[in-house]
Amino acid sequence: MIVPLVTIGQTKLYDNVFIKADDVNAYDNFLKEHYAKIHKERVSQGMLLQWDVWKVVDTPQEDFTHMVTYIYDIEKYPNQAAPYEMLGMSNLQWGTIQKKVNQMRERVAQVKWIDLGSARKKGMDYLPEIMVLNMMKVKDGKAGSYEKEEIKRTKSINNNSTRVGWNFHRRIGEYGNDVYFTHATIDWFDSYKDYLQGWYGEWSDSTEQGFNWNELRELKKMVVMKKLISSTDQ
């Protein structure tokens, strides 16, 4: 069974913070202990649509260890309520938590993006365990052509594929000519093994059938991450 591409309305705003943790396990535990409850409460009160933490897999040389994603409804953004107030915490208590987490990690980057399109296998109505984030930089003057081509060429996902989903995003915000990436695609998998098995197959030339992606965009980075925490978790 094949599910057709769905072009998503411009209602979601993704705010992504890239983190470099000194002690990864300590940071993982700190997030679970102090932040998961706060952001689940924000979701339940409608201040966030979703909150997810992704952890880089098997790539110690990567320049970040985690990606924290806040998904907002643009119609309700921003909200002014402090997250800690919803849990009855004082400003001092919140400040202490922030001081501790700042000693564990560094915020190395923050970017926002919006939806352009997606494709899913039938029955994939959940957040998968594995995300493959592809950071793309569009060629000068080719943004419109690239976006149309990306959507056109991922209209569906074959039922035999190890991939269960795909998303396409446009980076937004204030950045200059020296931007590292302008777009992102995400490939979703149910397990790391499924992702690895996707590499077992015959490769083709980039110019097969007269089309070359390199004329429209450059793949700057591909990072595999696993789900650590999500507000969708039961």
Q: Predicted segment positions?
A:
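Hydrophobic h-region of N-terminal signal peptides that target proteins for export
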Residues: 1-9
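Short S/T/G/P-rich N-terminal loop/turn motif that feeds into the first structured element of a domain
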Residues: 8-92, 96-234
